[in-house]
Curated annotation (Swiss-Prot):
Top-rank taxon, per record: Eukaryota
Post-translational events: The N-terminus is blocked. Trimethylation of Lys-118 observed in other calmodulins is absent here.
Name the UniProt record assigns to this protein: Calmodulin
Keywords in alphabetical order: Acetylation, Calcium, Cell cycle, Cell division, Metal-binding, Repeat, Vacuole
Residues bearing the modification N-acetylalanine: A2
Binding positions (Ca(2+) 2): D59, D61, N63, N65, E70
């Protein structure tokens, strides 16, 4: 669970600014109506139910609105997710030796061997098969992400 403690003062100040953009009437909380207004101004078109779901996800005290501490928790969570995506992208680059956007059986075998994992050709092929959703014999970035998310 991400917490506000993981945020810097600078980030908190930025989020306070963003919060005030949402909090149109300045009462210290964001309603579904205010959330809808901001999202529509950003070109999104959420339904009332979607807006309510978004609020319910972070509405810790159950009052139907998002206050600033709840908003901070939501932003801290989002930032943690982004770190994870970045880590997965970096890991993919390690495997994708030739940088063509795919991990071949040979590349996978090379990395696993260099990590001290002595795998048989069958084991490497099996790993590729499990992750290779479109059946082209190699693993693309999207397939790699799905595999990493399932494992974590």
């Amino acid at each position: 669970m991400a917490s506000q403690e993981s945020l810097t003062e600078e980030q908190i100040a930025e989020f306070k600014e963003a919060f005030s953009l949402f909090d149109k009437d300045g009462d210290g909380s964001i309603t579904t109506k205010e959330l809808g207004t901001v999202m529509r101004s950003l070109g999104q078109n959420p339904t009332e139910a979607e807006l309510q779901d978004m609020i319910n996800e972070v509405d810790a005290d159950g009052n139907g609105n998002i206050d600033f501490p709840e908003f901070l928790t939501m932003m801290a969570r989002k930032m943690q997710d982004t770190d994870t995506e970045e880590e997965i992208r970096e890991a993919f680059k390690v495997f994708d030796k030739d940088g063509n956007g795919y991990i071949s059986a040979a590349e996978l075998r090379h990395v696993m061997t260099s990590l001290g994992e002595k795998l048989t050709n069958e084991e490497v092929d099996e790993m590729i098969r499990e992750a290779d959703l479109d059946g082209d014999g190699q693993v693309n970035y999207d397939e790699f992400v799905k595999m990493m998310i399932v494992r974590n």
